[in-house]
């Protein structure tokens, strides 16, 4: 018995040292193939943060290792990937996802497996409200918050004929629900004269824009983004949709969606987004400079 105790005592420092050398693995899953314009800059920011954490000593004296997987923008694939990260890679927790429906699927997985999930991008409020669970947390303002940011300005303009256009999936449906509800509370006199819900990533921009033109709105609420937004803006400019209608668009101020518009960028829109060149706090200046130095590019 005594030799065994002595051996354990002798080996203890080496066991502790070996444990300290083992990195803490965390799992990240996202729709890199589906939305590279948004998620490649995101990935660069994630890698920069990981490098900074490890350079400063890691977490609890251990390096941080991020195991990255692509979820193909599909709820079923995302759950399969999440299971692989937890069961095979033995990560401490998982984070990421882009689409709201994918985020909800992974949140349900986290609940069933009782593993921490930090949703990086999904905006649907259901993620932490209606369908929330104690294992799921979010990084970004939800759809309710994003919409509420614009409602006061929308109400103050005094426009009464509103048209709606939003992608036909969880995020778009949630945005429409909250905008109509919040605006109607502040302005009971508004009417919604047209509503278009194109499939995500497959907008028939000509037909959608013409339907809105025919409805003669004096204001438009949109939650389109990415290529759907580009096509909508192009057709809207061509058909004069924005000439007599003020536009409120969630996320159109995100550089990933704003920059590709180039000379077609409309003026006077009310948007939410990330004005990376205008935020002048010490923390953001440090981040912006570090990102530029590491990647020779601006953050977005």
What role is predicted for each listed range?
Residues 4-16:
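Bacterial N-terminal signal peptides
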Residues 18-22:
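Boundary at the C-terminal end of the N-terminal hydrophobic targeting segment
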Residues 23, 38-44, 58-127, 139, ...:
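Beta-alpha junction/loop-to-helix N-cap segments that form part of ligand/metal-binding clefts
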Residues 27-47, 69-76, 98-99, 168-173, ...:
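Extracytoplasmic "Venus flytrap"
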Residues 44-66, 184-190:
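Signal peptide-proximal N-terminal region
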Residues 80, 125-126, 133-238, 275-286:
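Extracellular/periplasmic Venus flytrap/periplasmic-binding protein
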Residues 85, 89-98, 118-120, 163-166, ...:
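Periplasmic-binding protein-like
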Residues 235-300:
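Extracellular/periplasmic periplasmic-binding protein-like sensory domains
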């Amino acid at each position: 018995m005594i030799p065994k105790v002595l051996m354990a005592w002798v080996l203890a420092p080496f066991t502790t040292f070996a444990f300290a050398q083992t990195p803490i693995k965390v799992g990240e899953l996202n729709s890199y193939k589906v939305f590279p314009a948004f998620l490649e800059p995101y990935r660069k920011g994630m890698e920069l943060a990981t490098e900074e954490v490890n350079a400063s000593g890691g977490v609890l004296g251990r390096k941080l290792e991020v195991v990255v997987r692509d979820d193909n923008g599909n709820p079923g694939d995302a759950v399969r990937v999440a299971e692989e990260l937890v069961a095979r890679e033995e990560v401490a927790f998982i984070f990421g996802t882009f689409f709201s429906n994918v985020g909800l699927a992974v949140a349900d997985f986290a609940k069933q497996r009782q593993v921490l999930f930090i949703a990086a991008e999904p905006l649907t409020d259901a993620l932490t409200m209606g369908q929330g669970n104690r294992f799921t947390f979010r990084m970004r303002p939800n759809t309710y918050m994003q919409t509420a940011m614009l409602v006061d300005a929308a109400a103050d303009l005094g426009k009464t004929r509103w048209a709606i256009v939003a992608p036909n999936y969880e995020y778009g449906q949630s945005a429409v629900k909250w905008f109509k509800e919040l605006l109607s509370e502040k302005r009971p006199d508004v009417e919604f004269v047209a509503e278009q819900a194109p499939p995500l990533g497959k907008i028939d921009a000509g037909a959608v824009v013409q339907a809105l033109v025919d409805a003669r709105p004096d204001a438009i609420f949109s939650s389109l983004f990415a290529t759907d937004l580009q096509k909508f803006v192009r057709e809207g400019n061509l058909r004069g949709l924005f000439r007599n209608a003020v536009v409120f668009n969630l996320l159109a101020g995100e550089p990933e969606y704003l920059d590709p518009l180039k000379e077609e960028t409309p003026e006077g829109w009310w948007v939410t987004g990330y004005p990376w060149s205008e935020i002048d706090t010490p923390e953001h200046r440090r981040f912006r400079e570090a990102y530029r130095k590491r990647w020779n590019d601006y953050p977005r």
